[in-house]
């Protein structure tokens, strides 16, 4: 396993990010407000999922990075909530 840094760039709000390795994930979030970065351990030849929940004022831009590489960017809509999932 190697270590990589998961990080978020956001001006305001709260967030929870979870990297999912297997179908039966432990449910522990890897990056939680107020921390803006966390070290995670991954296997280079394994596919992972990312689930994110962000609560922030409407129009707040955010970017999520893995080892400095942009993997997701978005903007919080009028509900004040942005949530979703992606493959990393």
Located regions from the model:
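Beta-strand-rich recognition domains
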Residues: 1-20, 40-88
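Beta-strand-rich interaction surfaces with strong enrichment in secreted/lumenal proteins
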Residues: 28-29, 37-41
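Surface-exposed loop/edge segments in extracytoplasmic proteins
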Residues: 24-33, 69-74
């Amino acid at each position: 396993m190697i270590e990589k840094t998961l990080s978020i760039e956001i001006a305001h709000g709260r967030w929870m990010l979870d990297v999912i390795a297997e179908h039966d994930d432990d449910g522990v979030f890897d990056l939680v407000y107020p921390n803006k970065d966390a070290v995670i351990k991954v296997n280079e030849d394994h596919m992972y999922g990312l689930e994110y929940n962000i609560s922030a004022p409407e129009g707040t831009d955010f970017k999520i990075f893995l080892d400095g590489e942009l993997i997701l960017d978005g903007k919080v809509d009028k509900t004040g909530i942005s949530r979703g999932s992606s493959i990393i």
